[in-house]
């Protein structure tokens, strides 16, 4: 089976977008993944591969094409609503406005998936003094 393609915007250096290829393989290490960057010149076509649409405002008219598309925490914006077909499985979107834009029940509105990066950050050291 071919690797799951991680779809994200990589035209401008934006932390939220650029953590996609770092974060998703850590969250789901049992799944073989590789980057499928979004380019400024148009729609990305993953062909017969499955695509994970994750962190960022990626739900728009430039939505990728692929065999099966999995949406986890993405937001709607930057133009027209995406063309969602039967091959799209939405687990959650970034918030209530994204859910409403896609005519989804409010229960699909979660939070920006970027908050998951916190699972892999070291714990902050305890503070012993007021200024340390």
Region locations from a protein language model:
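Aromatic- and Gly/Pro-rich donor/ligand-binding loops
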Residues: 1-132
């Amino acid at each position: 089976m071919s690797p799951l393609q991680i779809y994200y915007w990589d035209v401008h250096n934006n932390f939220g977008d650029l953590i996609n290829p770092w974060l998703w393989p850590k969250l789901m290490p049992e799944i073989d993944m590789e980057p499928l960057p979004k380019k400024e010149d148009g729609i990305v076509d993953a062909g017969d591969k499955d695509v994970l649409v994750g962190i960022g405002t990626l739900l728009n008219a430039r939505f990728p094409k692929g065999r099966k598309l999995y949406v986890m925490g993405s937001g709607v914006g930057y133009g027209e609503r995406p063309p969602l077909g039967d091959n799209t499985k939405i687990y959650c979107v970034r918030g209530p406005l994204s859910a409403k834009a896609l005519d989804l029940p409010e229960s699909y509105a979660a939070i920006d998936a970027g908050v998951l990066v916190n699972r892999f950050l070291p714990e902050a050291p305890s503070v012993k003094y007021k200024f340390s």
